[in-house]
A protein has these predicted regions:
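Nucleotide-activated sugar donor-binding and catalytic core shared by glycosyltransferases
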Residues: 1-196
Length: 196
């Protein structure tokens, strides 16, 4: 891929949809409070159902080099521009994989857990656990570690992309139902592929 893994200049935060667990705001506050992340741009994406949009808008407006996107159709571009994603499980993992975007992942629903654990096992994502169990300290440590580790980011991105390619090309979903259900969702989103 043409992606450069040298350093993290831009982070994409996209938890998906309404983010009822409040992880988006929590991540923003956490990142903004750390001087070490001051030079890193932040792109934050939420769905139109996101309830605390006023608070989030004010939070992001108060920090230079950060942008808020609500119900955007710019996702492919944002993924291409980012050097690291912090997101939830679910089908967006496959979109991130297609753009060689290394990801820190938090499960925000029970049904996301098996897929996240499986992709972590395969070395395709850095999975931090269920949102209720992920402390601020754990988030900060994981973000700091992955920002400082170019080889880890590249390995995650390349493994995720390779798995995506296998899942798309292999017509026999044998022992990996999680992988294939995810790939099928993305295969149905070919409009996303065409924008890459």
């Amino acid at each position: 891929s043409a992606r450069n893994y040298q350093q993290v200049n831009r982070i994409l935060v996209s938890i998906g949809g309404s983010d009822t667990v409040g992880l988006t705001e929590r991540l923003c506050k956490l990142l903004f409070a750390q001087q070490v992340f001051a030079d890193i741009s932040l792109d934050v994406v939420v769905g139109s159902a996101y309830e605390k949009i006023t608070e989030l808008t004010e939070l992001i407006a108060a920090r230079a080099n950060s942008r808020l996107f609500v119900q955007t159709n710019e996702m492919a571009n944002l993924m291409r521009q980012a050097d690291l994603a912090i997101g939830a499980g679910g089908s967006s993992q496959w979109e991130r994989a297609l753009t060689h975007l290394p990801s820190l992942v938090v499960a925000v629903a029970d049904n996301q857990q098996p897929g996240c654990e499986y992709l972590q096992h395969l070395g395709a994502i850095q999975y931090l656990g269920r949102v209720e169990q992920v402390s601020d300290e754990l988030l900060l440590n994981a973000i700091t570690e992955i920002i400082e580790n170019k080889d880890l980011r590249q390995a995650l991105a390349e493994r995720a992309y390779a798995l995506m390619a296998i899942a798309q090309n292999d017509a026999s979903p044998s022992a990996t139902p999680v992988l294939y259900s995810g790939a099928e969702k993305v295969a149905r989103k070919m409009s996303f592929l065409s924008t890459l």
